[in-house]
From Swiss-Prot:
Pathway assignment: Catecholamine biosynthesis; dopamine biosynthesis; dopamine from L-tyrosine: step 2/2
Name listed for the protein in its UniProt record: Aromatic-L-amino-acid decarboxylase
Keyword Zinc-finger carried by entry: no
Pfam families: Pyridoxal_deC
Phylogenetic lineage: Eukaryota, Metazoa, Chordata, Craniata, Vertebrata
GO BP: amino acid metabolic process; carboxylic acid metabolic process; dopamine biosynthetic process; gene expression; kidney development; response to toxic substance
Record-linked InterPro entries: Aromatic_deC, PyrdxlP-dep_de-COase, PyrdxlP-dep_Trfase, PyrdxlP-dep_Trfase_major, PyrdxlP-dep_Trfase_small, Pyridoxal-P_BS
UniProt source species: Mus musculus
Binding site for substrate: T82, H192
Gene that produces this protein: Ddc
Length: 480
Protein backbone atom coordinates (compact mmCIF):
# COMPACT_ATOMS: atom_id res chain seq x y z
CA UNK A 1 0.00 0.00 0.00
CA UNK A 2 1.51 3.30 -1.06
CA UNK A 3 0.51 6.78 0.12
CA UNK A 4 -1.91 7.17 -2.75
CA UNK A 5 -3.86 4.06 -1.84
CA UNK A 6 -3.56 4.92 1.85
CA UNK A 7 -5.36 8.22 1.24
CA UNK A 8 -8.23 6.37 -0.42
CA UNK A 9 -8.42 3.50 2.05
CA UNK A 10 -8.02 5.82 5.01
CA UNK A 11 -11.05 7.83 3.95
CA UNK A 12 -12.98 4.60 3.46
CA UNK A 13 -12.01 3.44 6.95
CA UNK A 14 -13.10 6.75 8.47
CA UNK A 15 -16.46 6.29 6.75
CA UNK A 16 -16.68 2.71 8.02
CA UNK A 17 -15.91 3.79 11.58
CA UNK A 18 -18.42 6.65 11.45
CA UNK A 19 -21.10 4.34 10.01
CA UNK A 20 -20.32 1.72 12.66
CA UNK A 21 -20.68 4.16 15.53
CA UNK A 22 -23.72 5.90 14.03
CA UNK A 23 -25.49 2.55 13.70
CA UNK A 24 -24.12 0.80 16.76
CA UNK A 25 -27.38 0.67 18.69
CA UNK A 26 -28.86 -1.39 15.88
CA UNK A 27 -26.40 -4.19 16.67
CA UNK A 28 -26.91 -6.68 19.54
CA UNK A 29 -24.80 -5.28 22.36
CA UNK A 30 -23.45 -8.74 23.26
CA UNK A 31 -22.30 -11.27 20.65
CA UNK A 32 -24.15 -14.51 19.98
CA UNK A 33 -21.11 -16.76 19.54
CA UNK A 34 -19.59 -19.72 21.35
CA UNK A 35 -15.95 -20.03 22.48
CA UNK A 36 -13.75 -20.97 19.55
CA UNK A 37 -16.13 -19.56 16.93
CA UNK A 38 -13.42 -17.68 15.06
CA UNK A 39 -10.74 -20.28 14.34
CA UNK A 40 -12.76 -22.25 11.75
CA UNK A 41 -13.45 -18.99 9.88
CA UNK A 42 -9.77 -18.13 9.38
CA UNK A 43 -7.11 -20.18 7.53
CA UNK A 44 -4.70 -22.15 9.70
CA UNK A 45 -1.69 -20.32 8.25
CA UNK A 46 -0.90 -16.82 7.02
CA UNK A 47 -1.28 -16.24 3.26
CA UNK A 48 1.84 -16.65 1.13
CA UNK A 49 0.70 -13.98 -1.32
CA UNK A 50 -0.84 -10.57 -0.59
CA UNK A 51 -4.61 -10.38 -0.26
CA UNK A 52 -6.75 -7.44 -1.28
CA UNK A 53 -7.92 -4.72 1.07
CA UNK A 54 -11.48 -5.35 -0.15
CA UNK A 55 -11.33 -8.95 1.05
CA UNK A 56 -10.04 -7.89 4.45
CA UNK A 57 -12.84 -5.35 4.87
CA UNK A 58 -15.46 -7.95 3.94
CA UNK A 59 -14.05 -10.24 6.63
CA UNK A 60 -14.46 -7.56 9.29
CA UNK A 61 -18.25 -7.81 9.03
CA UNK A 62 -18.20 -11.54 8.32
CA UNK A 63 -15.71 -12.70 10.97
CA UNK A 64 -14.87 -9.96 13.47
CA UNK A 65 -18.08 -8.03 14.13
CA UNK A 66 -20.16 -11.12 15.02
CA UNK A 67 -17.79 -11.66 17.96
CA UNK A 68 -17.54 -8.07 19.17
CA UNK A 69 -19.04 -6.87 22.43
CA UNK A 70 -20.07 -3.33 21.56
CA UNK A 71 -18.68 -1.33 24.47
CA UNK A 72 -19.78 1.95 22.90
CA UNK A 73 -23.39 0.94 22.39
CA UNK A 74 -25.79 3.12 24.40
CA UNK A 75 -27.19 -0.18 25.71
CA UNK A 76 -23.86 -1.24 27.22
CA UNK A 77 -24.12 -0.76 30.99
CA UNK A 78 -21.47 -3.24 32.15
CA UNK A 79 -18.17 -2.79 34.00
CA UNK A 80 -17.21 0.91 33.80
CA UNK A 81 -16.99 3.18 30.74
CA UNK A 82 -14.16 2.89 28.28
CA UNK A 83 -13.63 6.30 26.75
CA UNK A 84 -14.07 7.02 23.07
CA UNK A 85 -14.20 10.22 21.06
CA UNK A 86 -13.44 11.26 17.51
CA UNK A 87 -10.64 13.68 18.52
CA UNK A 88 -8.89 10.85 20.37
CA UNK A 89 -9.27 8.53 17.37
CA UNK A 90 -7.71 11.13 15.10
CA UNK A 91 -4.83 11.59 17.54
CA UNK A 92 -4.32 7.82 17.64
CA UNK A 93 -4.00 7.82 13.85
CA UNK A 94 -1.31 10.47 14.07
CA UNK A 95 0.42 8.59 16.88
CA UNK A 96 0.57 5.50 14.70
CA UNK A 97 1.94 7.51 11.80
CA UNK A 98 4.68 9.21 13.82
CA UNK A 99 5.47 5.83 15.37
CA UNK A 100 8.11 7.02 17.83
CA UNK A 101 9.15 4.98 20.87
CA UNK A 102 9.45 7.70 23.48
CA UNK A 103 11.63 6.05 26.10
CA UNK A 104 13.80 9.16 26.47
CA UNK A 105 13.71 12.85 25.68
CA UNK A 106 16.21 12.33 22.86
CA UNK A 107 14.13 9.51 21.35
CA UNK A 108 11.44 12.10 20.60
CA UNK A 109 11.52 15.44 22.44
CA UNK A 110 7.92 16.35 21.55
CA UNK A 111 6.65 13.01 22.86
CA UNK A 112 8.28 13.59 26.24
CA UNK A 113 7.58 17.28 26.63
CA UNK A 114 3.92 17.16 25.56
CA UNK A 115 3.30 14.39 28.10
CA UNK A 116 4.81 16.47 30.89
CA UNK A 117 2.69 19.49 29.95
CA UNK A 118 -0.52 17.47 29.49
CA UNK A 119 -0.08 15.84 32.89
CA UNK A 120 0.31 19.29 34.41
CA UNK A 121 -2.80 20.48 32.54
CA UNK A 122 -4.77 17.54 33.88
CA UNK A 123 -3.37 17.91 37.38
CA UNK A 124 -4.52 21.53 37.43
CA UNK A 125 -7.97 20.49 36.19
CA UNK A 126 -8.14 18.20 39.24
CA UNK A 127 -6.74 20.90 41.55
CA UNK A 128 -3.96 18.56 42.65
CA UNK A 129 -1.49 19.98 45.17
CA UNK A 130 1.47 21.74 43.56
CA UNK A 131 3.78 18.99 44.83
CA UNK A 132 2.36 16.62 42.19
CA UNK A 133 3.05 18.94 39.27
CA UNK A 134 6.24 19.10 37.24
CA UNK A 135 6.13 22.81 36.43
CA UNK A 136 9.56 24.13 35.55
CA UNK A 137 11.45 22.88 38.59
CA UNK A 138 9.06 20.67 40.55
CA UNK A 139 10.18 17.55 42.40
CA UNK A 140 7.00 15.71 41.45
CA UNK A 141 5.26 15.17 38.15
CA UNK A 142 2.97 13.03 36.08
CA UNK A 143 3.43 10.10 33.73
CA UNK A 144 1.06 8.17 31.47
CA UNK A 145 0.96 4.47 32.34
CA UNK A 146 -0.85 1.83 30.31
CA UNK A 147 -3.39 1.00 33.03
CA UNK A 148 -4.22 1.52 36.69
CA UNK A 149 -2.84 -1.98 37.27
CA UNK A 150 0.55 -0.79 35.99
CA UNK A 151 0.38 2.36 38.11
CA UNK A 152 -0.29 0.37 41.29
CA UNK A 153 2.58 -2.00 40.52
CA UNK A 154 4.95 0.89 39.78
CA UNK A 155 4.01 2.57 43.07
CA UNK A 156 4.43 -0.64 45.06
CA UNK A 157 7.83 -1.44 43.54
CA UNK A 158 9.04 2.13 44.09
CA UNK A 159 7.86 2.04 47.71
CA UNK A 160 9.52 -1.36 48.20
CA UNK A 161 12.86 -0.13 46.86
CA UNK A 162 12.67 3.02 48.97
CA UNK A 163 11.98 1.25 52.27
CA UNK A 164 14.63 -1.40 51.64
CA UNK A 165 17.27 1.28 51.04
CA UNK A 166 16.18 3.22 54.12
CA UNK A 167 16.35 0.14 56.36
CA UNK A 168 19.70 -0.96 54.96
CA UNK A 169 21.13 2.53 55.44
CA UNK A 170 20.14 2.36 59.11
CA UNK A 171 21.15 -1.31 59.55
CA UNK A 172 23.62 -2.48 56.86
CA UNK A 173 23.49 -6.04 58.15
CA UNK A 174 19.77 -6.22 57.24
CA UNK A 175 19.70 -8.14 53.94
CA UNK A 176 17.17 -7.46 51.21
CA UNK A 177 15.78 -10.98 51.55
CA UNK A 178 15.28 -10.54 55.29
CA UNK A 179 13.52 -7.22 54.77
CA UNK A 180 11.28 -8.62 52.02
CA UNK A 181 10.03 -11.32 54.38
CA UNK A 182 8.80 -8.67 56.80
CA UNK A 183 7.28 -6.13 54.40
CA UNK A 184 3.49 -5.92 54.35
CA UNK A 185 1.06 -3.82 52.30
CA UNK A 186 -2.61 -3.00 52.90
CA UNK A 187 -5.73 -2.19 50.97
CA UNK A 188 -9.48 -2.28 51.50
CA UNK A 189 -11.41 -5.52 51.10
CA UNK A 190 -13.23 -3.67 48.29
CA UNK A 191 -10.07 -2.88 46.29
CA UNK A 192 -9.60 -3.97 42.69
CA UNK A 193 -7.97 -7.34 42.02
CA UNK A 194 -5.06 -5.54 40.35
CA UNK A 195 -3.84 -4.47 43.80
CA UNK A 196 -3.61 -8.11 44.85
CA UNK A 197 -1.81 -8.88 41.59
CA UNK A 198 0.72 -6.10 42.27
CA UNK A 199 1.48 -7.77 45.59
CA UNK A 200 1.98 -11.13 43.90
CA UNK A 201 4.33 -9.68 41.28
CA UNK A 202 6.22 -7.67 43.87
CA UNK A 203 6.57 -10.62 46.26
CA UNK A 204 4.79 -8.70 49.00
CA UNK A 205 2.29 -9.83 51.61
CA UNK A 206 -0.92 -7.89 50.99
CA UNK A 207 -3.60 -7.69 53.66
CA UNK A 208 -7.24 -6.72 53.17
CA UNK A 209 -8.51 -4.16 55.67
CA UNK A 210 -12.22 -4.68 56.50
CA UNK A 211 -14.41 -1.88 55.15
CA UNK A 212 -17.23 -0.25 57.09
CA UNK A 213 -20.96 -0.34 56.39
CA UNK A 214 -20.49 2.02 53.44
CA UNK A 215 -17.71 -0.19 51.99
CA UNK A 216 -15.08 2.39 52.97
CA UNK A 217 -11.67 1.84 54.58
CA UNK A 218 -11.55 3.82 57.82
CA UNK A 219 -8.85 4.86 60.27
CA UNK A 220 -9.73 2.44 63.06
CA UNK A 221 -9.52 -0.68 60.90
CA UNK A 222 -6.27 0.40 59.25
CA UNK A 223 -4.69 1.39 62.56
CA UNK A 224 -5.63 -1.96 64.08
CA UNK A 225 -4.05 -3.85 61.17
CA UNK A 226 -0.85 -1.79 61.34
CA UNK A 227 -0.44 -2.17 65.10
CA UNK A 228 -1.10 -5.91 64.98
CA UNK A 229 1.50 -6.47 62.30
CA UNK A 230 4.11 -4.21 63.90
CA UNK A 231 3.69 -6.17 67.14
CA UNK A 232 4.35 -9.35 65.15
CA UNK A 233 7.63 -7.93 63.84
CA UNK A 234 6.37 -7.06 60.37
CA UNK A 235 7.13 -3.81 58.52
CA UNK A 236 4.12 -1.92 57.10
CA UNK A 237 5.27 0.12 54.10
CA UNK A 238 2.47 0.57 51.53
CA UNK A 239 -1.27 1.35 51.54
CA UNK A 240 -3.61 1.56 48.55
CA UNK A 241 -6.73 3.67 49.07
CA UNK A 242 -9.50 3.38 46.49
CA UNK A 243 -11.72 6.23 45.36
CA UNK A 244 -14.63 4.71 43.45
CA UNK A 245 -14.38 0.95 43.95
CA UNK A 246 -15.19 -1.32 41.03
CA UNK A 247 -17.95 -3.19 42.82
CA UNK A 248 -20.01 -0.28 44.11
CA UNK A 249 -18.12 3.02 43.62
CA UNK A 250 -17.41 3.44 47.33
CA UNK A 251 -14.70 5.77 48.64
CA UNK A 252 -12.04 5.07 51.22
CA UNK A 253 -11.73 7.85 53.79
CA UNK A 254 -8.56 9.69 52.77
CA UNK A 255 -8.88 12.30 55.52
CA UNK A 256 -8.65 9.48 58.08
CA UNK A 257 -6.31 7.07 56.32
CA UNK A 258 -3.88 9.68 54.99
CA UNK A 259 -2.60 11.08 58.30
CA UNK A 260 -2.00 7.56 59.62
CA UNK A 261 0.14 6.72 56.60
CA UNK A 262 2.14 9.92 57.00
CA UNK A 263 2.65 9.32 60.74
CA UNK A 264 3.83 5.77 60.12
CA UNK A 265 6.07 6.62 57.17
CA UNK A 266 3.96 4.38 54.93
CA UNK A 267 3.61 5.12 51.19
CA UNK A 268 -0.01 6.01 50.34
CA UNK A 269 -1.12 5.29 46.77
CA UNK A 270 -4.58 6.38 45.58
CA UNK A 271 -6.39 4.35 42.93
CA UNK A 272 -9.21 6.44 41.45
CA UNK A 273 -9.29 4.60 38.12
CA UNK A 274 -12.96 5.32 37.36
CA UNK A 275 -13.98 8.13 39.68
CA UNK A 276 -10.96 10.35 39.08
CA UNK A 277 -12.40 11.86 35.92
CA UNK A 278 -15.31 13.30 37.92
CA UNK A 279 -12.95 15.33 40.09
CA UNK A 280 -12.62 17.92 37.31
CA UNK A 281 -16.15 19.00 38.33
CA UNK A 282 -16.08 21.30 41.38
CA UNK A 283 -19.12 19.58 42.90
CA UNK A 284 -17.24 16.25 42.99
CA UNK A 285 -13.79 17.56 43.94
CA UNK A 286 -14.54 16.99 47.65
CA UNK A 287 -14.23 13.26 46.98
CA UNK A 288 -10.49 13.84 46.47
CA UNK A 289 -9.99 15.71 49.75
CA UNK A 290 -7.00 14.19 51.49
CA UNK A 291 -4.96 13.68 48.33
CA UNK A 292 -2.34 15.92 49.93
CA UNK A 293 -1.40 12.97 52.17
CA UNK A 294 -0.67 10.68 49.21
CA UNK A 295 2.70 9.81 47.72
CA UNK A 296 1.15 8.79 44.39
CA UNK A 297 -2.22 9.22 42.71
CA UNK A 298 -3.69 7.53 39.64
CA UNK A 299 -6.84 7.57 37.53
CA UNK A 300 -7.79 6.53 34.01
CA UNK A 301 -8.76 9.22 31.49
CA UNK A 302 -9.37 6.24 29.21
CA UNK A 303 -12.37 5.33 31.34
CA UNK A 304 -14.45 8.48 31.58
CA UNK A 305 -12.61 11.45 30.08
CA UNK A 306 -13.08 10.74 26.36
CA UNK A 307 -9.44 9.71 25.80
CA UNK A 308 -9.37 6.31 24.11
CA UNK A 309 -7.49 3.41 25.72
CA UNK A 310 -4.72 3.35 26.79
CA UNK A 311 -4.12 6.39 28.95
CA UNK A 312 -3.71 5.99 32.71
CA UNK A 313 -2.57 9.15 34.49
CA UNK A 314 -0.21 8.80 37.45
CA UNK A 315 1.38 11.51 39.59
CA UNK A 316 4.06 11.29 42.26
CA UNK A 317 5.27 13.87 44.77
CA UNK A 318 8.90 12.81 44.40
CA UNK A 319 10.00 11.72 40.95
CA UNK A 320 13.23 10.39 42.47
CA UNK A 321 11.19 7.65 44.15
CA UNK A 322 10.47 6.27 40.67
CA UNK A 323 13.77 6.98 38.99
CA UNK A 324 15.59 5.55 41.99
CA UNK A 325 13.71 2.29 41.59
CA UNK A 326 13.70 1.87 37.80
CA UNK A 327 16.81 3.66 36.53
CA UNK A 328 18.64 1.53 33.95
CA UNK A 329 21.12 3.40 31.78
CA UNK A 330 22.93 1.28 29.17
CA UNK A 331 25.19 3.22 26.85
CA UNK A 332 22.88 2.81 23.86
CA UNK A 333 20.13 4.75 25.69
CA UNK A 334 22.30 7.60 26.95
CA UNK A 335 22.07 11.06 25.41
CA UNK A 336 23.80 14.38 25.89
CA UNK A 337 20.94 16.12 27.75
CA UNK A 338 20.07 13.46 30.33
CA UNK A 339 22.15 14.97 33.14
CA UNK A 340 21.13 18.56 32.48
CA UNK A 341 18.37 18.50 35.08
CA UNK A 342 15.93 20.05 32.62
CA UNK A 343 14.46 16.99 30.92
CA UNK A 344 12.59 13.80 31.79
CA UNK A 345 13.37 10.31 30.55
CA UNK A 346 10.10 8.46 31.12
CA UNK A 347 11.70 5.02 30.78
CA UNK A 348 12.73 5.49 34.42
CA UNK A 349 9.09 6.03 35.48
CA UNK A 350 7.57 2.75 34.26
CA UNK A 351 7.92 -1.03 33.86
CA UNK A 352 8.51 -1.29 30.08
CA UNK A 353 11.14 0.59 28.12
CA UNK A 354 9.08 1.63 25.08
CA UNK A 355 6.11 3.95 25.16
CA UNK A 356 3.66 5.39 22.64
CA UNK A 357 2.93 9.06 21.97
CA UNK A 358 -0.21 8.84 24.12
CA UNK A 359 -0.27 12.48 25.17
CA UNK A 360 -1.43 13.42 21.66
CA UNK A 361 -4.85 12.00 22.55
CA UNK A 362 -5.04 14.14 25.65
CA UNK A 363 -3.97 17.25 23.73
CA UNK A 364 -6.61 16.73 21.03
CA UNK A 365 -9.41 15.94 23.49
CA UNK A 366 -8.64 18.73 25.97
CA UNK A 367 -8.47 21.32 23.20
CA UNK A 368 -11.50 20.18 21.19
CA UNK A 369 -13.81 19.68 24.21
CA UNK A 370 -12.40 22.20 26.64
CA UNK A 371 -12.73 21.75 30.39
CA UNK A 372 -16.38 22.86 30.27
CA UNK A 373 -17.22 20.29 27.61
CA UNK A 374 -15.61 17.50 29.63
CA UNK A 375 -17.43 18.62 32.77
CA UNK A 376 -20.75 18.63 30.91
CA UNK A 377 -20.08 15.08 29.72
CA UNK A 378 -19.42 13.83 33.28
CA UNK A 379 -22.48 15.63 34.65
CA UNK A 380 -24.73 14.13 32.00
CA UNK A 381 -23.69 10.60 32.95
CA UNK A 382 -24.25 11.31 36.63
CA UNK A 383 -27.71 12.72 35.88
CA UNK A 384 -28.59 9.58 33.90
CA UNK A 385 -27.48 7.34 36.75
CA UNK A 386 -29.75 9.23 39.14
CA UNK A 387 -32.56 8.90 36.62
CA UNK A 388 -32.10 5.13 36.65
CA UNK A 389 -31.89 5.15 40.45
CA UNK A 390 -35.24 6.96 40.59
CA UNK A 391 -36.85 4.35 38.33
CA UNK A 392 -35.58 1.53 40.55
CA UNK A 393 -36.79 3.21 43.74
CA UNK A 394 -40.29 3.58 42.27
CA UNK A 395 -40.58 -0.21 41.93
CA UNK A 396 -41.15 -1.86 45.34
CA UNK A 397 -39.82 -5.18 44.04
CA UNK A 398 -36.30 -3.74 43.87
CA UNK A 399 -33.81 -2.20 46.28
CA UNK A 400 -30.86 0.17 45.85
CA UNK A 401 -27.82 -1.34 47.57
CA UNK A 402 -25.41 1.60 47.90
CA UNK A 403 -25.46 5.37 47.67
CA UNK A 404 -25.43 6.58 44.07
CA UNK A 405 -22.67 9.20 43.84
CA UNK A 406 -21.40 9.08 40.26
CA UNK A 407 -22.41 6.99 37.25
CA UNK A 408 -22.98 3.58 38.87
CA UNK A 409 -26.19 2.19 40.37
CA UNK A 410 -26.07 -1.04 42.39
CA UNK A 411 -29.51 -2.64 42.67
CA UNK A 412 -31.24 -5.99 43.05
CA UNK A 413 -34.58 -7.69 43.35
CA UNK A 414 -35.64 -8.10 46.97
CA UNK A 415 -35.12 -11.78 47.54
CA UNK A 416 -32.53 -14.49 47.16
CA UNK A 417 -29.22 -14.40 45.36
CA UNK A 418 -30.50 -17.14 43.07
CA UNK A 419 -33.40 -14.93 42.01
CA UNK A 420 -31.02 -12.13 41.05
CA UNK A 421 -28.64 -14.50 39.29
CA UNK A 422 -31.56 -15.71 37.19
CA UNK A 423 -32.59 -12.15 36.38
CA UNK A 424 -29.08 -11.24 35.24
CA UNK A 425 -28.86 -14.38 33.13
CA UNK A 426 -32.14 -13.46 31.43
CA UNK A 427 -30.99 -9.88 30.84
CA UNK A 428 -27.72 -10.86 29.20
CA UNK A 429 -29.21 -13.76 27.25
CA UNK A 430 -31.69 -11.38 25.62
CA UNK A 431 -28.71 -9.30 24.37
CA UNK A 432 -30.68 -6.04 24.35
CA UNK A 433 -28.58 -4.56 27.15
CA UNK A 434 -25.48 -5.78 28.94
CA UNK A 435 -24.88 -5.77 32.71
CA UNK A 436 -22.39 -7.43 35.05
CA UNK A 437 -22.82 -8.22 38.76
CA UNK A 438 -20.91 -7.71 41.96
CA UNK A 439 -21.13 -9.26 45.41
CA UNK A 440 -21.64 -7.01 48.42
CA UNK A 441 -21.63 -8.60 51.87
CA UNK A 442 -22.58 -11.95 50.31
CA UNK A 443 -25.44 -10.39 48.34
CA UNK A 444 -25.54 -10.88 44.57
CA UNK A 445 -26.04 -7.39 43.15
CA UNK A 446 -26.62 -6.04 39.64
CA UNK A 447 -24.52 -3.08 38.48
CA UNK A 448 -25.90 -0.45 36.09
CA UNK A 449 -23.04 1.74 34.87
CA UNK A 450 -23.70 4.62 32.49
CA UNK A 451 -20.99 4.06 29.90
CA UNK A 452 -21.45 5.16 26.29
CA UNK A 453 -20.66 8.64 25.01
CA UNK A 454 -23.97 8.61 23.11
CA UNK A 455 -26.27 7.31 25.86
CA UNK A 456 -29.42 9.37 26.42
CA UNK A 457 -32.40 9.32 28.75
CA UNK A 458 -34.37 7.28 26.19
CA UNK A 459 -31.81 4.47 26.39
CA UNK A 460 -31.97 4.45 30.18
CA UNK A 461 -35.78 4.34 30.09
CA UNK A 462 -35.79 1.47 27.59
CA UNK A 463 -33.20 -0.42 29.62
CA UNK A 464 -35.33 -0.12 32.75
CA UNK A 465 -38.47 -1.24 30.93
CA UNK A 466 -36.57 -4.28 29.70
CA UNK A 467 -35.24 -5.10 33.18
CA UNK A 468 -38.69 -4.61 34.72
CA UNK A 469 -40.37 -6.89 32.17
CA UNK A 470 -37.80 -9.62 32.70
CA UNK A 471 -38.13 -9.25 36.47
CA UNK A 472 -41.88 -9.85 36.14
CA UNK A 473 -41.17 -13.00 34.15
CA UNK A 474 -38.63 -14.25 36.70
CA UNK A 475 -40.95 -13.59 39.64
CA UNK A 476 -43.86 -15.34 37.91
CA UNK A 477 -41.69 -18.38 37.26
CA UNK A 478 -40.63 -18.46 40.90
CA UNK A 479 -44.25 -18.52 42.08
CA UNK A 480 -45.10 -21.33 39.69
Amino acid sequence: MDSREFRRRGKEMVDYIADYLDGIEGRPVYPDVEPGYLRPLIPATAPQEPETYEDIIKDIEKIIMPGVTHWHSPYFFAYFPTASSYPAMLADMLCGAIGCIGFSWAASPACTELETVMMDWLGKMLELPEAFLAGRAGEGGGVIQGSASEATLVALLAARTKVIRQLQAASPEFTQAAIMEKLVAYTSDQAHSSVERAGLIGGIKLKAVPSDGNFSMRASALREALERDKAAGLIPFFVVATLGTTSCCSFDNLLEVGPICNQEGVWLHIDAAYAGSAFICPEFRYLLNGVEFADSFNFNPHKWLLVNFDCSAMWVKRRTDLTGAFNMDPVYLKHSHQDSGFITDYRHWQIPLGRRFRSLKMWFVFRMYGVKGLQAYIRKHVELSHEFESLVRQDPRFEICTEVILGLVCFRLKGSNELNETLLQRINSAKKIHLVPCRLRDKFVLRFAVCARTVESAHVQLAWEHISDLASSVLRAEKE
